[in-house]
Structure formats: structure tokens, C-alpha cells
UniProtKB/Swiss-Prot annotation:
It comes from the Bacteria. Substrate binds at R25, Q26, A27, G28, R29, F44, D75, Y152, T207, H330. SUPFAM superfamilies: UROD/MetE-like. This is Uroporphyrinogen decarboxylase. Belongs to the uroporphyrinogen decarboxylase family. InterPro entries: UROD/MetE-like_sf, Uroporphyrinogen_deCO2ase_HemE, Uroporphyrinogen_deCOase. Keywords: Cytoplasm, Decarboxylase, Lyase, Porphyrin biosynthesis. It comes from Xanthomonas campestris pv. campestris (strain ATCC 33913 / DSM 3586 / NCPPB 528 / LMG 568 / P 25). It is found in: Cytoplasm. Pathway: Porphyrin-containing compound metabolism; protoporphyrin-IX biosynthesis; coproporphyrinogen-III from 5-aminolevulinate: step 4/4.
Amino acid sequence: MLKNDRLLRALRRQPVDRTPVWLMRQAGRYLPEYRATRARAGSFLGMAKNPDIACEVTLQPLERFPLDAAILFSDILTIPDAMGLELYFVEGEGPKFRHPVRDADAIHRLGVPDMETELRYVMDAVRLIRRELDGAVPLIGFSGSPWTLACYMIEGGGSKEYARIKAMAFNAPQLLHHLLSTVTDAVIAYLSAQRAAGAQALQVFDTWGGVLSPAMYREFSLPYLTRIAQELERGSGEERTPLVLFGKGNGAYVSELAASGAEAVGVDWTISLADAAERAGGRVALQGNLDPATLYGSPDAIRSEVGKTLDSYAYGNGGSREGHVFNLGHGMSPDMNPDHVGVLVEAVQTLSKR
């Protein structure tokens, strides 16, 4: 039995006593306790692949702040790693793959990993976190989107130009669709396994959807997000596990994402929540969308921006605050002040009371 079900109620667009709040990368390098755990574990992957440490890190922000959800500590690149691409991290450069997929042979060899063998460490972490939370708040599981995962899988790491994957989109679109279809199968299986292990809400991160032109987004990202929303078994009624589709730079597509079958759409700060709510038309809950850079501001500036964000949603939603989950428009950065995060959380709680 959940002691705090605000998040789930808001995602179902049901009344809540105040707007729920959680933050992308709420467990991260801005916390000194996270940095201490990382030093002990030796590396990011040393934390993510150890269920006990993943559980410890997941719970750290909840011990500091009265957040309304925990989100699994993991990485979006666990799926391609389990497919054999071999994930590693370079200090200052981020994630890389030793075996990127760039031709038909490599792409056709890919299969959906077994979730309770190759990715058992993730499922064990979900089970352990649920046990440790003991119903305090819901646990969010997540995956990268097919397009975003394909970007890393083809580029071999992060990219500024996305030259290789865009070249494939123009020169061999059917090959790219084959890859995206395989990755979509894997994402559905991965989220389904997290749900079975105990995740109570699910989020798909389409981090790089915003690098696409509208026509390319509608060909190479949106159909696969829609497939996830429609094919991922989530139960029904009050037992249904809500699905959030989050995208960076997805403001132009809120109406289409709202028609996907997902319960909620997460947006960044490049669209106002008023505009997003009007486009959503009451079909889904919305999550977002404070610019993370607001946390560099003074406490008064943070409170002011939190108030504007809450009011913007209500303005676009016919005066109602229901159906809104407060979050940042993207993840926090390592140099952010934990005290300012506390100011943000307190401001949401105070200013959104019904």
C-alpha cells in the first residue's frame, strides 16, 4: 500500500492535495553522498550494475528532500550494452560503445536481450528498491527511446552532428527502421520486466528526438514511441501503470504524443506549459518543465520561477492544476547546489497546495 500516491494520481489526472514533484537526475553528482558512493564503487557502471549500490543511490535524494517519487538509478544505455555493444565511459566525454552498429550485418545480428539474465542486475535493483521504499513513494522505471538509443548505437557515443545516423536515415532508411523496430521490441520487453519487478510508473526518455526535422521525427521517432505506448502491457483501471513519454525539444509534437496512448507527456522548457496543456487538450497529464538552470538562481528567483511554472500549467488547463507533475525540463548538472533543490521542492509544495 502506497503511503504517498500523489504521483500516480496526478499521472491519472485525478485530484491531489498538491502538485507532486520529482526531478530528473535527482540521484546524481550534485549530491556529496552520491560522489562518496561513486568513489567507493570505482565507476558509474560499478554503481549501476550493483543492485545494492543502485538501491542506495536511488534512495539518497529521498533522504534529503520530501520528493513524491523515486526513480531507478541506472542508465538508458543498458539495453544496447546487453545487446553486445559493450558500454564504457570516458572521463569528460561520457558513454561510448566498443562495438557500434553501422552496417546491415551488425544490425541484423542484433536480438532482444533476455531481461532476467543479461539485465538481471536492473530487475534485482528494482525489486530491492521496492522493498526498501516500503510503500513510502512510488518507484519509476525507465528506458531510452528507440531513436535515442539508435543514435548512441550508430554514432558509438554522444554526438553534436548525428552524421552517421542521419546519413543512414537518408541513404538506408529501411535499415534504420529495422534497427528501430528491434530496439522498440527490446524497450517494450525491458519496461515490461521492470513493471513485473515492481516499477509503479514508467518513463521513456527521447533525449535526442529534438535533433530531427519535423518530417524525420514523424518517421523515425514518433511511430516507435506510439508503438511502445500501445503495445506495452500496463494493466487497467486503478492498477494501470502510467507511462510518461519525455522528449527534449518535443514541444511541437505534444498533440501527437497525447494521441499515442501514453498517460503523460514530459516536456522541456522550450515550450510553455500553458501552450503544452492547450495542445494536450486534457488527453494526458503533463510533466515538467522548469529550466534546470533556474537552480543557479537565488532562492527568491527559484520560488518565483516555480510559481510561474505552476501558473502556466493551470492557465493552459482551464484553471485547473490537476494532471501536472512538477519536474525540470531535463536533468540536473553536477555543479548545482543541493540547498537550491530543497528550495525548489519546498516551493512546489507550498505554492501548489489545493
